[in-house]
Amino acid sequence: LDFDRTDTGKICLTDEQTGVPVTENLIFRAARCLQEDTGCGLGANIHLHKRLPMGGGLGGGSSNAATTLVGLNALWETALSKQQLMTIGEKLGADIPLFIFGQSAWAEGIGEQLTAIELPPVWYLIVVPDAHVSTGKIFAHQGLTRNTHPIKIRAFLERGGSNDCQAVVESLYPQVKEARLWLAQF
């Protein structure tokens, strides 16, 4: 993301490939929320250089919104605290506060209650199946149950966790299941 401050009060967002209408883009919405919540009359020209695949489940949109809040807070000199930025971010998406938090954290509630945790270093292999997984579609799906017993930090650190969305995602996007099964053989 590139940010240029303007005195016009307008938010102009350009991107290379998302195809999302500007007013629905989390970057634009984050900038607008920051303006409204602070009464800031400044604007910005924002350019997105998209590198993560849309619908890949990697939090790209939420990370971009968090970066926008943090970046424009500095650029516009609105002097909001990290906690205030996290509160604005929560209005836009449950995982946005995590990206503002800026370190590994245990999330509770809908993702807004964060506790810093230390995690051992790990390596990740990212496989990108030919699927655009819609977060909204997954969370609205009838098959996504809300009856999972909460797990505590200690149990997670000792035994790991699970992904409640996995069964729904794999039923709607078989190519995701194929990729997981392929990885499981190693």
Residue ranges and their predicted role:
Residues 1-42, 148, 154-155:
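N-terminal beta-alpha supersecondary unit
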Residues 56-82:
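DPxDG-like acidic metal-binding loop motif
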Residues 130-145, 153:
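A short core secondary-structure module
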Residues 1, 27, 61, 127, ...:
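Residue-level signal for inorganic ion chemistry
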Residues 78-133, 174:
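Alpha/beta catalytic cores of group-transfer enzymes, especially the acyltransferase/condensing modules
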Residues 30, 39-40, 45, 86, ...:
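Glycine-rich, charge-dense phosphate/pyrophosphate-binding loop(s)
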